[in-house]
Amino acid sequence: MAKSGEALPQGSLAPAQDSQLIRVTVKTPKDKEDFSVVDTCTIRQLKEKISHRFKAHPNQLVLIFAGKILKDPDSLAQCGVRDGLTVHLVIKMQRRTIGTECPSPPVSIPGPNPGEIPQSSSVYSVDGSPSFSLGVLTGLSGLGLTSGSFSDQPGSLMWQHISVPELVAQLVDDPFIQGLLSNTGLVRQLVLDNPHMQHLIQQNPEIGHILNNPEIMRQTMEFLRNPSMMQEMMRSQDRALSNLESIPGGYNVLRTMYTDIMDPMLNAVQEQFGGNPFVTATTASTTTTSSQPSRTENCDPLPNPWTSTYGVSGGRQGRGGRQSGDQDASENRNRLPSFLGNIGLFDYLQQLHETSQSLESYLQGTVPTSNPSQESPLSGNRVPPTLPSSPKSGSGQSLPKESVAIKGKSSCPAFLRHSTENSTGQGGSLHDAGKGSTGPSTSLPNLTSQIGDSANRSSFVSTPSSLMSATPGVPESPWLPPTGYSRSLRSAGTNQVPRIQNEIHQQLPLLLHLQTAMANPRVMQALLQIEQGLQILATEAPRLLLWFMPCLTGLNGVTGGTEAREGVVMSEDPRPTPTPQISLAQGSTELGIHSSPFLQVLQALASTNPQQLQLEAHFRVQLEQLRAMGFLNLEANLQALIATEGDVDAAVEKLRKS
């Protein structure tokens, strides 16, 4: 331990009157010593004092405090060293010159031009072992930068305070290191002598090409001397790469850079640490296949995950060239998703289409005929919805079994007849709706059966308004909710669940048949004829549409504000039943809920303009391209193509701005 009265070395400055005596702890990886000095003492004076204790020349000592290397002219007070603080010490190896010291075995550095090696100094090691055994940056012992205990320093606490960039910059500023690194051929040879680098280059020849380029080696050494320049270069490179993807063809350039440079280097590093044992052979083969570089530009748009597989595949087949009949069929098939998409049903149908078991249960399930003993007699004015004519009033005959079987078939879904929920509860409290009805009513089941199934086309038949009440003796179809639930629970579920979801579940069979029938060109031709007829009726006789669709309230704008007709009228003397009564408003609301999706489909068909269909056929290829890009709004795409005269790029810009 040094004492407070210990004299300073020769040539040191006398302490000023306001100087204070402080104690500084000098710590090495293995030793720790305390020194008493004044706070105005310079770093050079402190090194001279420390050199006597550690038996080393002052030029070999490097003092580090707070992550910074202390400079000789600065004082302890200027560096922030106060009483009780610790300064870390690194002892460099002494440099030996050829003329003054006895020669030891010099290191033979292989190189293409040995004469270019700087002659001012030579590289020696303590035990005579060759230096640079691990390359330029790993063999620090041969550069005279370490002491005998330097191998223990990476695990010590000293490295928590060392600023690595500044230390590397100071090392590179050494004249000997600069002269050594200025010879790119020598640096290349030193790197190639490393067995790890040799193995890396054998596995990845691209790295060898980088080492063979003197300009790249020169730039690397320049960046090594100037860390701030390297950081700026990396920042600008990241910015350039981020902007490159937005340039046409930039994605392929990034992919080539990754497959040719980055991917081999990452694979080489992974091989050194061992492969991943959890990677299966399938994953490895997939990675190998996908890592092959693509030499051609990608002209196909990326698939849109939100579009249906059917629509995208149809668009790709259309580019390959098909027959005219197939094009018309594809055009007709692609028109229905736009209609169903407007009312929010297409995605749900696509999900059901992917589950084959549910489709089988919907399309193949038939309702068994009920036991005649369980069938209750019909009321006077009640007519089965699917019968072509109504039986006589008051006959009291039960419903035939053939009619029950027809109603249970999948070709005539239960949605086509009005549900018993409009007029019956658990046991069957019925309202006599037919007594007070005025005027003819609709035959909506027959109309929907024509659209839903081409095999069951029947003529329009006018039946009384009592069609809105179902026959209590007819069993329900499997896809309808069971009648055992109470009306209060069903009403609560209707209020809580979104309205469109209830409509989809109630009217699912018709929509499934619509989707299946779209593949038949004759069915599409019939739908187009119905579409043209609805357009004529909407313009020439709008009130006639209300006769076909009495519960359609959405056509009030078409009819010019005509009054909506009441579909159900309460009887003056209802029969008392133990089950709770269903009010008129509730029955009308439920009737509108069950029938509104089909009427929305009819509105979509009726609102389609023939001129728009011609434009869709004209811009069919462009519309498929826009749909593949993710623009799913058919109307907006068509308007953009009309405004840009079929230019897809201009249409995309217009759609983005809108």
From Swiss-Prot:
Q: What PROSITE patterns is this protein classified in?
A: UBA, UBIQUITIN_2
Please report the stretch or stretches of sequence annotated as the UBA domain.
614-658
**Where is this chain compositionally biased, Gly residues type?**
312-323
User: Positions of the region Disordered?
Assistant: 280-336, 362-478
Tissue expression pattern: Testis-specific (at protein level).
Q: Residues in domain STI1? A: 194-233
Q: Name one Pfam family in it.
A: ubiquitin
Ranges of compositional bias, category Low complexity: 280-291
Regions of compositional bias (Polar residues) in chain numbering: 362-379, 389-400, 438-469
Residues in Ubiquitin-like domain copies: 22-96
Q: Which SUPFAM superfamilies match?
A: UBA-like (SSF46934), Ubiquitin-like (SSF54236)
UniProt protein name: Ubiquilin-3
The species this protein was found in:
Mus musculus (Mouse)
